[in-house]
């Protein structure tokens, strides 16, 4: 099985990191979640509905849609908060990346543990910019909102390609494909990891600073 890989880059002010990451991760998981499966007998099941809600950002001029699941939201908040803290405490140039990996389990014979086979990985590269004053912050609030909107459109376009997804499992195999631990939604199995880098992400950071400078010059 070939694992698809998608890379997104965002350039944000420090206080925008959490909202930007949540917007991207929630958008991806909105398209990679189903309602809960209700099995009647082996091979026959119904799928519950997935509720959605609009989320308005505080530090970005942007509204995104997420799955209406408090459990999923808490899990993503926890992962993003850990990344944000690591980024802040790293002493680096404010460069890092978060990976959202979807995988399925392949049962192994005892005494070996199950094999986790990734089928799609999203990498979000984050560049944190420093701004001089409130005027620049207000411009950044709008510009990041515009750029984030473009990223969301990119995500939706990828989702609409109808490429490989794990086939719908039987009842005995559902835990090999979906995370069934949540009571109100059933995302494909996923894991989130992050890393902080020391190299300066000059291309995206410089682009954002140029956008702000050009706007100030108008």
UniProtKB/Swiss-Prot annotation:
<keyword id="KW-0963">Cytoplasm</keyword>
<comment type="function">
    <text>Autophagy factor required for autophagosome formation.</text>
</comment>
<protein>
    <recommendedName>
        <fullName>Autophagy-related protein 101</fullName>
    </recommendedName>
</protein>
<dbReference type="GO" id="GO:1990316">
    <property type="term" value="C:Atg1/ULK1 kinase complex"/>
</dbReference>
<comment type="similarity">
    <text>Belongs to the ATG101 family.</text>
</comment>
<keyword id="KW-0072">Autophagy</keyword>
<dbReference type="InterPro" id="IPR012445">
    <property type="entry name" value="ATG101"/>
</dbReference>
<dbReference type="GO" id="GO:0000407">
    <property type="term" value="C:phagophore assembly site"/>
</dbReference>
<dbReference type="GO" id="GO:0019901">
    <property type="term" value="F:protein kinase binding"/>
</dbReference>
<dbReference type="Pfam" id="PF07855">
    <property type="entry name" value="ATG101"/>
</dbReference>
<dbReference type="GO" id="GO:0000045">
    <property type="term" value="P:autophagosome assembly"/>
</dbReference>
């Amino acid at each position: 099985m070939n694992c698809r890989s998608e890379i997104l880059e965002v350039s944000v002010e420090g206080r925008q990191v959490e909202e930007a990451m949540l917007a991207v991760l929630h958008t991806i998981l909105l398209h990679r979640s189903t309602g809960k499966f209700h099995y009647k007998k082996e091979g026959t099941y119904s799928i519950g509905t997935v509720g959605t809600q609009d989320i308005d950002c505080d530090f970005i001029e942007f509204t995104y849609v997420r799955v209406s699941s408090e459990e999923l939201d808490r899990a993503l908040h926890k992962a993003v908060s850990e990344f944000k803290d690591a980024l802040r405490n790293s002493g680096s140039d404010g460069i890092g990346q978060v990976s959202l990996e979807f995988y399925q389990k392949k049962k192994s014979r005892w005494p070996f543990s199950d094999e986790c086979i990734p089928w799609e990985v999203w990498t979000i590269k984050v560049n944190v910019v420093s701004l001089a004053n409130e005027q620049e912050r207000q411009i950044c609030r709008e510009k990041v909102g515009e750029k984030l909107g473009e990223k969301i459109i990119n995500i939706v376009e990828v989702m609409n390609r109808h490429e490989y997804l794990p086939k719908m499992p039987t009842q005995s195999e559902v835990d090999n494909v979906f995370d069934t631990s949540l009571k109100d939604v059933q995302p494909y199995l996923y894991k989130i990891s992050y890393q902080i880098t020391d190299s300066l992400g000059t291309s995206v950071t410089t682009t954002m600073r140029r956008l702000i400078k050009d706007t100030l010059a108008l």
